[in-house]
Amino acid sequence: QRTRVEHYIALARDAGARVVTGGGRPAGLPRGWYVEPTILAGVDNAMRVAREEIFGPVLCLIPHDGDDDAVRIANDSPYGLSGGVWSADAERGLAIAKRLRTGSIAINGTYPPFPRVPFGGFKESGLGRELGPDGLHSFLEPRSIGLPAALRPDAGN
């Protein structure tokens, strides 16, 4: 996994991104799977680091020209498991969150899974839902039985 994350950081550099912080192995930890938390600037949404799941501590900073452009960039992804919106204006944050194509969205914080709320992604981020009533349905096999009139509950009335 460490090799994979380091490969993505190298790809980003080769494509013109700049490492703002991190990008290597933590000092004093030459062994193990550790990679420094890394921030990449100058990332374009067409770069692999912006389009693929890295599964490591890498944050890509992608510039935008306002809310509409930010939503366009965020939705221009084959994935949509979860997202986050940060805004000093809660109504603006909610308006933006409603436009994002992700299965769950946090506004000004994190979104922990709640047992009673469905969890799952859009697009290529998973199939179906976990948790909540929607998650239960995948474990059920509903069926219907047609009853003759004599066996119906209201037959004696």
What is the predicted role of each segment?
Residues 1-4:
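Structural signature of PLP-dependent enzymes
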Residues 27, 34-157:
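Conserved C-terminal structural/oligomerization subdomain of aldehyde/semialdehyde dehydrogenase
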Residues 19-22, 107-109:
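General beta-strand structural signal in soluble alpha/beta enzymes
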